[in-house]
UniProtKB/Swiss-Prot annotation:
<feature type="binding site">
    <location>
        <position position="922"/>
    </location>
    <ligand>
        <name>Zn(2+)</name>
    </ligand>
</feature>
<feature type="binding site">
    <location>
        <position position="919"/>
    </location>
    <ligand>
        <name>Zn(2+)</name>
    </ligand>
</feature>
<keyword id="KW-0436">Ligase</keyword>
<dbReference type="InterPro" id="IPR002300">
    <property type="entry name" value="aa-tRNA-synth_Ia"/>
</dbReference>
<dbReference type="InterPro" id="IPR002301">
    <property type="entry name" value="Ile-tRNA-ligase"/>
</dbReference>
<keyword id="KW-0479">Metal-binding</keyword>
<keyword id="KW-0030">Aminoacyl-tRNA synthetase</keyword>
<keyword id="KW-0963">Cytoplasm</keyword>
<keyword id="KW-0862">Zinc</keyword>
<feature type="binding site">
    <location>
        <position position="899"/>
    </location>
    <ligand>
        <name>Zn(2+)</name>
    </ligand>
</feature>
<dbReference type="GO" id="GO:0005524">
    <property type="term" value="F:ATP binding"/>
</dbReference>
<dbReference type="GO" id="GO:0000049">
    <property type="term" value="F:tRNA binding"/>
</dbReference>
<keyword id="KW-0547">Nucleotide-binding</keyword>
<dbReference type="InterPro" id="IPR010663">
    <property type="entry name" value="Znf_FPG/IleRS"/>
</dbReference>
<feature type="binding site">
    <location>
        <position position="561"/>
    </location>
    <ligand>
        <name>L-isoleucyl-5'-AMP</name>
    </ligand>
</feature>
<dbReference type="GO" id="GO:0005829">
    <property type="term" value="C:cytosol"/>
</dbReference>
<dbReference type="Pfam" id="PF00133">
    <property type="entry name" value="tRNA-synt_1"/>
</dbReference>
């Protein structure tokens, strides 16, 4: 048999079938760096409209985990898609560098006491730099393009100085408060914590009911209308923090709740109890009392001013009114310790009650505290409960499990503790109202983010921005020793401090002799040594980065972070921006869910479900990780597992194989010379170009709307359905067997060229390494990188009429039914391949109209050796109906010989003596002028 291989146009390309991403991606990365790709893009986009995605700074501690990898990948997809849309979209990465975690690591390594404060801060700075280098390598290895040589660091001298300037503007605008307020306090940190540093965990706590005895029982009884009685009156409170009882200054009741006087017997003694009417039954059940009488009914405001004896201190405390009292649990009477609770503090402030804080910075009672002096607060619960029991004031005690605030770093329970702190006042100068108004102007993605952050801002207390730590940006203020007032020239003095910090770091403030700035006035002022909350550091990036860097702008077009940042960076950025310039720092905010395993569990070493991005990159490649990130619905929790990553790897392989098919059939195609005019294109090729063009519109819209899973699905379907199992399958015959430079083949190549030009750009924001690798093998003159181009726009006008489009949709369905039938025949051993079959289609008028025009070329669409069409009502006995209404099929095994070149079974095989093993079509294609195709 003659070998006709040399007469065929078999696919050829150097683009590798095997991706080998772990080895190949670093080579691409090196090429980008040699090319200075990021700078080239900036130069290329100069003067174009800006699009700014502002990078929320990750903490400079530890390697990138899957959450940060997901974060940076989504950001990179956005930035690259905007670049392809023609925007100048610079990406300036940043790092959050101050704060406790770095202090703890340095302390563990070097010891805090062995170093001077300045040496300790330098050690923290060095440690942060080392962590940044690790993370920078991780992010670059993921293919994230950005200004990695010039990131912003919150510990850069310039940034530290600008943070002081931001604070100076906030001071000048009247938003700073100094107050002695209860704040979340971590004894292990020895410092206040911000709301965003608090996490809630289950904790076992003692829940106790404690009786406060009325000083004038007779007067109380009379208020309730009970006369001629001598029984004592108790006001029971319910609390899960018995350790706060030494700081009790009052008992709060709700002014509008109804309270009852309940007569009962407790501890073998008659007693009257004042309880919220709605809680009487549950309280008495708790006390194990079945027999009791309810006397009288008063609203809470009638109890105001009643005096009670503290259960174990020589202290008389009043009943006061508080809107925070509820009937959800307890007794309706709330133990009020202003030093240890924010609501307690606010209600006590109205009554001008003393605020005594008996707890030190390490969470221990000060030495002279009655009974529990020197003890850690949580250990003080037991002796207090024992004392209450011995004195007859303990009405009930049990242990409960409840959600309780913990330190995000130490995982230890927090306390509320009153200390002198600096606050941004939420109600000062209308900050809260303006924040709520600005939230409504921002686009929140998903939309529920607006309500979430709105509620948080509406409910939040003043923002405590001061911390008692070494490693941080100082609050460079001077306080008058007698009046406690800020120095009248504070903003101007802060600018001078900023100039010093710019040159010498934050040490300049801590080392500063006040006389340098204040002269003789220095003796009257005290220098503040607190540092700023790290959420303030990162919250002013809009001022220190967006406003300062020439290539950026404020407001940013988008902030993109995890949904936990509604209470973190989104909020701190919003509040500082409003306090500085009276508008939000962002136009839109996109949030995503936590990365969890396939069962919805958080990643943890103890569960053994931790997947490190470095391992994924090492084993599968960064592009597989990026494809996984794009495929996930980020509006909910994001699942990951080895199985999920394997699915992403399989999808990647399909995309790569599609690209390889395109490239391998364009090896001899020069777009300048070989492109076929649209009016000469084979109809199927025109359909393919039109389909590609339509899909591109959808893909670009999806990129603009940040609908990454929809893009993934569209590309996946394009590779597997429209292209893989339909168009590319059909045109193989034409590509391989038609005359090399004949119109049928060049028409198909023209379509493949347009598809490849569009396709490589679609995938570029997601699988960036692979897209740029494909780009190097594309035909024609081009830029050195796909990222120096825009979405492909040089499509011919291949628009189809609605009728034509409908016809091709029907053809897809018809071919699907034929394929199913042929597969059955194959499985039954009746045929080896589809080319061994001859198909008769019995079609109704609707379907007939779609396929009749194809005539002889229908067999190429169905990839059978013969295909004919007859009316549906002429079905033979051998025909069978399909799932497509109006279509029946009859399949016969061809009796003709197989062509040695195209493998079709045709009656013309053997008819031409010189080429007895070829069909007439192959003789024409191989040795004569070649066939013509009109439709397929």
């Amino acid at each position: 048999m003659t070998d006709y291989k040399d007469t065929l146009n078999l696919p050829q390309t150097d683009f590798p079938m095997r991706a080998n991403l772990p080895e190949r991606e670093p080579q691409t990365l090196a090429r980008w760096q040699t090319l200075d790709l990021y700078r080239k893009i900036r130069k290329d986009r100069e003067g174009q409209p800006k699009f700014i995605l502002h990078d929320g700074p990750p903490y400079a501690n530890g390697r990138a985990h899957l959450g940060t990898a997901f974060n940076k990948t989504l950001k990179d997809i956005v930035v690259k898609s905007k670049t392809l849309s023609g925007f100048d979209a610079p990406f300036v990465p940043g790092w959050d560098c101050h704060g406790l975690p770095i202090e703890l690591n340095v302390e563990k390594k070097l010891g805090k006491d062995k170093l001077s404060a300045n040496a300790f801060r330098q050690a923290c700075r060095d440690y942060a730099f080392s962590q940044i280098e690790l993370q920078r390598d991780d992010f670059q290895r993921l293919g994230v393009l950005g200004d990695w040589q010039h990131p912003y660091l919150t510990m850069d001298f310039g940034y530290e100085a600008d943070t002081v300037r931001a604070l100076a503007k906030i001071v000048a605008n009247g938003h700073l408060l100094r107050g002695q307020k209860p704040v979340h306090w971590c004894a292990a940190c020895g410092s206040a914590l911000a709301e965003a540093e608090v996490e809630y965990r289950d904790k076992a706590s003692p829940a106790v009911d404690v009786g406060f005895e009325a000083v004038d029982a007779e007067a109380v009884r009379q208020r309730f209308g009970v006369k001629n009685a001598t029984t004592r009156v108790l006001v029971p409170i319910w609390t899960t923090t018995p350790w706060t009882l030494p700081a009790n200054e009052a008992v709060s009741v709700h002014p509008e709740l109804h309270y009852a006087l309940v007569k009962s017997e407790l501890q073998n003694q008659p007693v009257y109890l004042i309880l919220a009417k709605d809680l009487v039954d549950s309280a008495m059940q708790r006390y194990g009392v079945d027999d009791y009488e309810v006397h009288g009914n008063l609203k809470g405001d009638a109890l105001e001013g009643m005096q009670l004896q503290h259960p174990f201190l020589d202290r008389i405390v009043p009943i006061i009114l508080g809107e925070h009292v509820t009937t959800e649990a307890g007794t309706g009477n709330v133990h009020t310790a202003p030093a240890h609770g924010l609501e307690d503090y606010f209600v006590a402030e109205k009554y001008n009650l003393p605020i005594n804080n008996p707890v030190d910075a390490r969470g221990r009672f000060i030495p002279d505290t009655f009974l529990v002096g020197g003890q850690p607060v949580f250990k003080a619960n037991e002796p207090i409960i024992v004392l209450l029991a011995d004195s007859g004031h303990l009405l009930h005690s049990e242990t409960i499990q409840h959600s309780y605030p913990h330190c995000w770093r130490h995982k230890t329970p927090l306390i509320f503790r009153t200390t002198p702190q600096w606050f941004i006042g939420m109600n000062k100068n209308g900050l809260r109202e303006r924040a709520l108004a600005e939230i409504e102007k921002v686009t929140w993605l998903p939309a529920w983010g607006e309500a979430r952050i709105g509620k948080m801002v509406a409910d939040r207390p003043d923002w405590c921005i001061s911390r008692q730590r070494l490693w941080g940006i100082p609050i460079p203020l001077f306080i008058h020793k007698k009046s406690g007032e800020l120095h009248p020239k504070s903003p101007a003095l802060m600018e001078k401090v900023a100039q010093l910090i710019e040159k010498e770091s934050v040490d300049a403030w801590f080392d500063l002799d006040p006389k340098v700035l204040l002269g003789d006035d220095a003796d009257h002022y005290e220098k503040v040594t607190d540092v700023l909350d790290v959420w303030f550091d990162s919250g002013v990036t809009h001022f220190c980065v967006l406003e300062k860097r020439r290539e950026l702008k404020v407001p940013a077009d988008i902030y993109l972070e995890g949904s936990d940042q509604h209470r973190g960076w989104f909020q701190s950025s919003l509040l500082t921006s409003l306090a500085i310039r009276d508008k939000a720092p962002y136009k839109s905010v996109l949030t995503y869910g936590f990365v969890v395993d396939s069962q919805g569990r958080k990643m943890s070493k103890s569960l053994g479900n931790v997947i490190l991005p470095a391992d994924v990159v090492k084993n599968l490649g960064a592009d597989v990780l990026r494809l996984w990130a794009a495929s996930m619905d980020y509006t909910v929790e994001v699942n990951v597992s080895d199985e999920i990553l394997k699915r992403a790897s399989d999808a990647y392989r399909r995309i790569r194989n599609t690209a390889r098919f395109l490239l391998s059939n364009l090896y001899d195609f020069d777009p300048k010379k070989d492109k076929v005019a649209v009016d000469q294109l084979v109809a199927l090729d025109r359909w393919a170009i039109f389909t590609t063009q339509k899909l591109q519109e959808k893909i670009i819209t999806a990129y603009d709307r940040y609908r990454f899973p929809a893009i993934y699905q569209a590309i996946h379907n394009f590779c597997t359905v429209e292209m893989g199992s339909f168009y590319l399958d059909i045109i193989k015959d034409r590509l391989y067997t038609s005359k090399e430079s004949g119109l049928p083949r060049r028409s198909a190549q023209t379509a493949l060229y347009y598809i490849a030009e569009a396709f490589v750009r679609w995938i570029a924001p997601i699988i960036s390494f692979t897209a740029d690798e494909i780009w190097q093998f594309m035909p024609g003159d081009r830029e050195p990188s796909v990222f120096l181009t825009q979405w492909f726009s040089d499509f011919p006008n291949a628009a189809l009429s609605g009728e034509e489009e409908q016809r091709w949709q029907l053809l897809l369905q018809i071919r699907d039914e034929v394929n199913k039938a042929l597969e059955t025949y194959r499985n039954e051993g009746k045929i080896g391949s589809a080319l061994a079959a001859e198909v008769v289609l019995y079609a109704d008028e609707r379907l007939n109209a779609a396929i009749a025009t194809l005539g002889e070329e229908l067999r190429f669409v169905l990839i059978t050796s013969e295909a004919s069409v007859l009316p549906f009502n002429e079905k033979s006995k051998a025909a069978f109906d399909t799932a497509l209404p109006g279509l029946a099929l009859e399949i016969n095994v061809s009796e003709f010989e197989k062509c040695a070149r195209c493998w079709q079974r045709r009656s013309s095989v053997g008819q031409i003596k010189e080429h007895a093993d070829l069909c007439d079509r192959c003789v024409s294609n191989a040795f004569e002028d070649g066939e013509m195709r009109q439709f397929a």
